[in-house]
Amino acid sequence: MAGKTFFIDTTKCTACRGCQIACKQWNMNPATKTTQKGSHQNPEDLSFSTFKLVRFSELEENEKPVWYFFADQCRHCLEPPCMYTAQSLGVKAIIRDEATGAVLYDPKVKVKAADAKTIRESCPWNIPRWDQKTTGMAKCTMCIDRVKEGLLPACVKTCPTGTMNFGERAKMLEMANKRLQEVKAKYPKAQLLNAEIVRTIYLVIDDPQKYHKFASAEDAEEITSIAAIKKLIRPLANLSQFLG
């Protein structure tokens, strides 16, 4: 399948949060007011105005502190459950750009709270966010405006360590698999997360749960099936609305 893909190599991440700041800056999103929660992670979670978040998982192993860094963002699924769920609900807020594969939200489309909750719950990675004030939904846009002009997404452009990579899907898959083999020599548990169903591929060296609760979708086949079912029932939902 063609289109664009991110490859995020967590083994190179220093949690500088340059990607997080660049995302805010390019999208002109405001800073999120936060309070100290006893962690270096800031803000606490993704939001309507925070599309990219470097998560800090601070654990103890063999009586030594261990940090796992995870630059969280939308996975831009090949078969996006959020989009098919929205369509089955009659919500016209989510589309997919066929050239890049980017899953795009229109934050100006008003979405009912109940529908937004259903859409968010359909996402295995807990990404979609709803704004109570505007009643719109938002998330990572793959910097579609930059990509269409031949530029890298802001987060990739600013990354100083090579953690963030972006390009044609075939090239990114090749890069990811090559890097996986290199890393496995030292970290046998290393794996690529859900590479067969997403356009944001993570390389991790340990149990994904140590990085983040929603780092990996447990049953990729089931997710793909659910998306396919929603795709099939969408015409029926549209017909039902047409008939009143």
Spans of model-derived segments:
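Non-ligating segments of multi-cofactor redox enzymes
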Residues: 1-244
